[in-house]
Amino acid sequence: MTATKTAALTLLALVAFASNSLLTRLALGTHQIDAASFTAIRLVAGAVMLLALAAAQDRSWSVMQGRGVAGPLALFAYAAPFSFAYLRIGAAVGALVLFGVVQLTMIGYGIARGERPGAMIWLGLVLAAAGLALLTVPSVTRPDPLGVLLMAIAGVAWAVYTLVGRGTANPIAANARSFFWSAPLALVLVLVVIGLHPEAAPSARGIVLALVSGAVTSGLGYAIWYRALPSLTVTQAAVAQLSVPVIAALGAVAVLGEAVSSRLVVAGVLVLSGVGLVLSARARQPRVERSTRA
């Protein structure tokens, strides 16, 4: 693959990942759909897209072969809090919290597994953690605490999902299976919400936004990312993901009309700088885990 094509595919995938935050906030922030229905439609649409791509790749439906409940459970544990968080916080804040928590969880997992971080990695961890903590300090501009907590839970779950799927021979098929088997969990959640709030009725616009989030920015976005990934070094792939919260923030301002506070800017600089330091230090180590964005 040429360098130009790799760059184009990488940029397209990163924009897709950032767009998940924008689409979810656009749908839920304007009350076009309830969070449970958005989650269910997103997972079902993602499953259909990924299954079609995987089947076309293998020219069979053998992609559904495979066991394990950890992937579907982790995916659902990410998708549901992700949606409910965007009832309370903006896309820019949500993308930053998600990115920061995913990276910190992955790094923490490495340390728990025996990695011995040097001074540069510890400095990066402190900076990133400080940036996330800054978002929770009480003030007039503080994001909704419950929304931040829900997104943090989503971040931990996505990190677990990434760790469960690492080293998979066919990542598109593995993602397809996880989306397929997580969808019933989301449908149960919908039934619970309907039981509690029978008046909830998704609008056509809300349904379309959920379908696009599932089929295009999730399903197709992952496929594009995995197409570009073999042509990227581990460091290039990791550093490229630093742009996702920035793209989401720019989109939140341009598309959603969100105001970016000085608190968010400072928190963003701390988180991205901290993660950047960690990635720079880990690039010199023999083994570095790859992760994917939501």
Model-derived regions, located:
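Membrane-interface interhelical linkers
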Residues: M1-V15, G46-A70, R113-W122, V140-L146, ...
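Transmembrane alpha-helices of multi-pass small-molecule transport proteins
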Residues: H31-A77, V101-Y109, A157-Y161, S178-I194, ...
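Hydrophobic transmembrane alpha-helices of multi-pass small-molecule transport proteins
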Residues: L50, A54, L75, P117-V137, ...
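Specific alpha-helical transmembrane segments that line the substrate/conduction pathway
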Residues: S37-V48, L75-F76, S83-R116, A154, ...
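Hydrophobic/aromatic residues within transmembrane alpha-helices
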Residues: A27, F38, R42, A85, ...
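Glycine-/small-residue-enriched transmembrane alpha-helix faces in small-molecule transporters
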Residues: M1-A40, L73, A77-P81, A130, ...
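Specific transmembrane alpha-helical segments of multi-pass solute transporters/efflux pumps
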Residues: A16, Q57-F99, I107, L127-L134, ...
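Helix-helix packing/entry segments at the starts of transmembrane helices
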Residues: G94-V101, G165-P184, S218-A254
